[in-house]
Design a protein with these regions (language model features):
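Conserved catalytic core of the tyrosine transesterase superfamily
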Residues: 1-196
């Protein structure tokens, strides 16, 4: 088996899958009393280090955030919302799902704090910057035109129809605004999180 693995030059993840299959087979053989012990129990592969996530330099982020607003009024409205998303991702390090699920009641503008329910349904308090506050306030001035009145339980980031933005929509808007700014980086929310 070792010779076959070496000949095929399998990747680390392929080797892990192969070892997992062997372990399962050996466990089945042991449970069926075909083997007295599982010879694969003590065998472990060396873990390969994961590559670090990409980074974006500050000048590139500033180029995106400081780009002029579009000329069309409907595009200007989208830009206000998108800029609030970008500023929030950049200044707080939130995950995409956390931005997506953010509600109006979760924002404390006076203390520049967000109440975030993250992975494992755990709640934490996250600070955000004054530029993100200003962008959020600019967006929320426009918000009633899209959603109607302010409801504390309403999502902060919504579509023109007043529905909460989905993860894919947020990803697409982040990419779109990077392209509009003339940035060649494949920008996505998780990359902004790592710039925090």
């Amino acid at each position: 088996l070792a010779v076959k693995v070496e000949q095929q030059q399998l990747s680390s993840s392929s080797l892990q899958r192969l070892l997992s299959a062997i372990r399962q087979f050996m466990k089945w053989a042991q449970d069926g009393q075909y083997l007295e012990f599982n010879p694969s129990d003590d065998f472990q592969l060396k873990r390969q280090p994961r590559p670090l996530p990409g980074m974006v330099d500050i000048e590139t982020i500033q180029q995106i955030l400081d780009q002029p607003k579009p000329e069309k009024e409907s595009d200007q409205e989208l830009w206000l919302r998108d800029k609030a998303i970008l500023e929030l991702l950049y200044s707080s390090g939130l995950r995409l799902a956390e931005v997506q699920s953010l509600k109006i009641k979760d924002i404390d503008f006076n203390r520049l704090l967000l109440r975030i329910t993250g992975k494992g349904n755990k709640t934490r308090v996250v600070p955000f910057g004054s530029k993100a506050r200003d962008a959020l306030m600019d967006w929320l001035k426009l918000y009633p035109l899209w959603h109607g009145d302010f409801v504390p339980d309403a999502h902060v980031f919504i579509s023109l129809k007043g529905n909460p933005l989905g993860a894919r929509q947020i990803e697409n808007r982040v990419k779109f605004q990077a392209q509009r700014a003339g940035v060649s980086v494949d920008l996505h929310p998780h990359l902004l999180r790592h710039c925090f």
